[in-house]
């Protein structure tokens, strides 16, 4: 009997989802993206070769896997073609194995221009977006004015819709933000040049997934960003523009929620965050700098340095509630090698003195929050590339067990290096 497994970030993104998707793809027929856009950077290292996928599902590196882009994903035609060409130049067959929902909203140059203009206007209060037009594209979707992949089938109607929406955007860009307008003809020509390639990959994603389930096929749903960046449940307004939680699978792919069997939450052995917003356990000392250095904490898409801090079990408890997480995969365990002590945030002290065990929702409710830590002995031994759990240092094992205790969720997979072979599967999500 086939299983449907969701892989998603349980923190603020950048947890190492791409590697784990790639690892588990060996046993699936389909890998599905259901939210986000090319603001996601999933880094895979296979046999020492590095690949960063932003829009195409990570299963594309497996020749027997079909990759699906669901309706919840915003698609930049330019970014999609660039990524396809990069993979095809390496001999990977993409367009024969990539299927796209016609309901995917399109990201076009005016979305990018608006994204940049808004961030510049916000100055120090900027959200910290990737500047790739994700938010404005989702806005158009909700406002019911957006262009979608399906619109590319009727080129005359597309041109007319584009003209109207570009007038709307250019009026704001020129008159309010005082920046250059986006050129209509160039935008139209660039999209039309690749329209046939994109429409050639359009398919009924919901029916494909339903048929696969009925045929007993394994399906993997690949999340982007992380739980605490969810548009509804994250640290609003310092969030992304899509539902990064498990509920986004159903709405973003058309797959019935009762058909999901297992939710794997990816967590780092510590915490990181890119951009603005609350981060209770953030470290500003030498320890934080050392974690960033050892963990090579720079964004795969933006190159921005990530903020680093101790493991936050309070935020994770919220992620467990939101996602009904079945088990964790802990990545970058080896980054904590060599520290005299390691810490776990087990509660927050609110400004009024109240002790809470679950993270607040809105960013404003995090102001003045203090972390309450448990301190555990660190380990000096090297855990890098260890693939036998029994060979881990005892203090490392104690740290893992304590995280399981304070969160109430088992750690089913451990990662001790960037390559997919540097992994320990303690409980197989497809057999759970």
Curated annotation (Swiss-Prot):
Annotated GO biological process = 'de novo' AMP biosynthetic process; IMP metabolic process
What's the top EC group for this one? ligase
Catalytic residues of the enzyme: 14, 42
Q: Name one GO molecular function term.
A: magnesium ion binding
Cofactor note text: Binds 1 Mg(2+) ion per subunit.
Where Mg(2+) binds, per the record, is at 14, 41
Residues annotated for substrate binding in this entry: 300-306
Give a GO cellular-component term: cytoplasm
What pathway or pathways are given for this protein in its record? Purine metabolism; AMP biosynthesis via de novo pathway; AMP from IMP: step 1/2
EC numbers listed for it are 6.3.4.4
Question: Which positions in this protein are listed as binding GTP?
Answer: 13-19, 41-43, 306, 332-334, 415-417
Q: Which NCBIfam families does the entry link to? A: PRK01117.1, purA
Assembly and oligomerization: Homodimer.
Instruction: Return the protein name.
Output: Adenylosuccinate synthetase
